[in-house]
């Protein structure tokens, strides 16, 4: 019995340290529920709106978000799916409009947008698409009208337009071409008519 006593005491201590924890809104409705160990959230936690509807299903490890996280609108539709690692956004992520259509998708690296991201109109058509480096838009970007036709495209440097850009009407026909420098229009810009003929439009300093 003497040899087993330390094991018994340790077991009791562990049980006391790990416990289900429930928080409530001021109105008395449940706010969140999950497991805590030494006052740190661990495992699966559910969070709720004041209405009682589920707002999030989160996963913790030693008090930090870790793994797949899901968020919901008050009407119950899925709002977002994120991957966290050691309390930072990592890997793929998906966000949705309240009606259910995909709003945007892409990748995170240490809480910052990284790589290709795509954004969508509520009707499901692509809104814009481009690359990020350390959270900043760079490289070739395309923007689209709500009905799906290409609107404009060009290069971004540090989040600003740079070099040649092309603009299209809602039927997909080329409308304007010109250049940018650090987000400002420069040089001679051209305009295209319905027959596709180019003419000088405006000179920028």
Protein language model regions, located:
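Glycine/tyrosine- and acidic-biased, solvent-exposed loop/turn segments at the edges of beta-strands
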Residues: 16-205
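Bacterial Sec-dependent N-terminal signal peptides
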Residues: 1-21
